[in-house]
A protein has these predicted regions:
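N-terminal nucleotide-binding beta1-loop-alpha1 segment
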Residues: 1-18
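Conserved N-terminal catalytic core of the sugar/cofactor nucleotidyltransferase
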Residues: 2-4, 30-116, 407
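Short beta-strand/turn micro-motifs composed of small residues
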Residues: 9, 52, 100, 127-128
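Short glycine-enriched, charge-decorated loop/helix-capping segments at active-site entrances
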Residues: 20-26, 71, 185-188
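Conserved core of the sugar-phosphate nucleotidyltransferase
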Residues: 57, 61, 65, 106-190, ...
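Conserved alpha/beta core of the MobA/IspD/sugar-nucleotide pyrophosphorylase nucleotidyltransferase superfamily
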Residues: 164-265
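Phosphate-binding active sites in nucleotide-utilizing proteins
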Residues: 260-298, 302, 308
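Glycine-rich hexapeptide-repeat left-handed beta-helix
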Residues: 304-453
Length: 453
């Protein structure tokens, strides 16, 4: 039997107290609407249909062609929202699966089970046993134990308030029955049309079936910032369990934050208070953290990043950074680079084996293989109007507190004395020092004490 999926996402989200539409709020780095679409895709049925209202343009743009859309201009209830999609869906499938976009944590196997259930009646729904059922409509059963209807919390009788089985707002309808019965749903005293009325209709027309869902984390509904935080914590636990099962170590998983788009290699250890954000890729056998943020960056095998922030940067294999390093957009550290404490690199490439021990800034620079950047070195790359490049050759030795005033080139094997202000190019193998820096002799001359900075 063929299937289509419908996601209800037209709510105002006023309790979120945010200018951002509710469906655009992120969970572990991904907007809620994309999580809902991915859940629908996993259930089958091709491109889902979203019923949207507030923030419709932003939701459409975020979906990027992965869904079809209908609008619900007035919020007249969930049955009215489904009716808005009839023109798109009628005649396209035998079954219609419906769920709420603000309950985006359904596991693929749960929705597939709902979609594939073979029921005698026209409706199958998901239910759960809630410790606190006040947020949900209660599932009312008849004397034989069959589903008889759903009663919202405000309308419960004293006897019904003891019911703990709740309606989870996810349904699979026989399509022809759905479109026929929607027209028969009567308005509530508030003038709204509720999808839950169809449960009672189905109970009198072949029966409504219920599938229990035990994992309460799947059915977290998001209406407030507190709900959003609860859902994010649940999704984070799910993500971390997956990486632990894949051979990634976490000293304290409760303090590790890995985005849905991040990847981590086997054997890597992630220490407490570490964030892997966006499309970050970490290789095998690394140690990341503690207190580290990797944002949209690539980290090769066997790297060590400690107490540092790495943004839009690339680290090849066997690189060490930190503690307290900051790699900014365009930083590229080749194999075996060491960047010590309190260093910053922006839009610069450091060649294989280069060392930048501490307290240095490299911006808009190219550093050759094996070069040594002494403590306190700064590339003075901005003249007040535009940025300029600095080039440091392979094997160069930059003395402590050197100021390299760009644009400038320091040649291969060249050296600068401590405290030098380099305003002109330094040829290969030469030593310069002073303010401004002047040539003294070839860097290899015997009177120069190698190793001093």
């Amino acid at each position: 039997m063929t299937l289509r999926t419908l996601i209800l996402a037209a709510g105002l989200g006023t309790r979120m107290k945010s200018v951002l539409p509710k469906m655009m709020h992120p969970l572990c780095g991904r907007p809620m609407v994309l999580l809902a679409i991915e859940a629908a895709e996993a259930a089958g049925g091709g491109k889902p249909v979203l019923v949207v209202g507030h923030g419709a343009d932003a939701v459409r743009e975020c979906a990027n062609g992965r869904a079809e859309f209908v609008e619900q201009p007035e919020l007249l209830g969930t049955a009215d929202a489904v009716r808005r999609a009839e023109g798109l869906l009628r005649g396209t499938a035998d079954k219609v699966l419906v769920f709420y976009g603000d309950m985006p944590l359904w596991k693929p196997e749960t929705l597939r089970r709902l979609a594939e259930e073979r029921a005698a009646g026209p409706l199958v729904m998901l239910t759960g046993i809630a410790a606190d059922a006040r947020m949900f409509g209660r599932v009312i059963r008849d004397a034989a134990g069959n589903v008889a209807g759903v009663v919202e919390n405000a309308h419960l009788t004293a006897e019904q308030k003891s019911v703990r089985e709740v309606n989870l707002g996810a349904y699979c309808f026989r399509a022809d029955w759905l479109w026929e019965m929607l027209a028969k749903v009567k308005p509530s005293p508030k003038g709204e049309y509720y999808l839950t009325d169809l449960v009672e209709m189905a109970a009198h027309d072949g029966g409504a079936s219920a599938i229990p869902v035990d994992d309460e984390e799947e059915w977290i509904g998001i209406n407030t910032r507190a709900h959003l935080a609860e859902a994010e914590a649940a999704l984070r636990r799910r993500i971390n369990r997956r990486w632990l099962e894949a051979g990634v170590g976490m000293q304290d998983p409760s303090t590790v934050y890995v985005s849905l788009d991040a990847t981590v290699g086997e054997g890597t250890m992630i220490l407490p208070n570490t964030h892997l954000e966006g499309k970050t890729a970490v290789g095998r056998d690394c140690v990341i953290g503690p207190n580290t943020v990797l944002r949209r960056s690539a980290v090769g095998d066997r790297c060590r990043v400690e107490c540092s922030v790495v943004e839009d940067a690339t680290l090849e294999e066997d690189v060490s950074v930190g503690p307290f390093g900051h790699l900014r957009r365009g930083a590229y550290l080749e194999r075996g680079v060491h960047m010590g404490n309190f260093g910053e690199v922006k839009n610069s490439r450091l060649g294989a084996g280069a060392k930048m021990g501490h307290f240095s800034y490299l911006g808009d620079a190219a550093v050759g293989a094996g070069a040594n950047i002494g403590a306190g070195t700064i590339t003075c790359n901005y003249d007040g109007q535009q940025k300029h490049r600095t080039e440091i050759g392979a094997g160069a030795f930059i003395g402590s507190d050197s100021m390299l005033v760009a644009p400038v080139k320091v040649g291969k094997g060249a050296r600068t004395g401590a405290g030098s202000v380099v305003t002109h190019d330094v040829p290969d193998g030469e030593l310069v020092l002073g303010v401004p820096a002047r040539k003294i002799r070839k860097a290899g001359a015997k009177s120069v004490k190698r190793g001093r900075r």
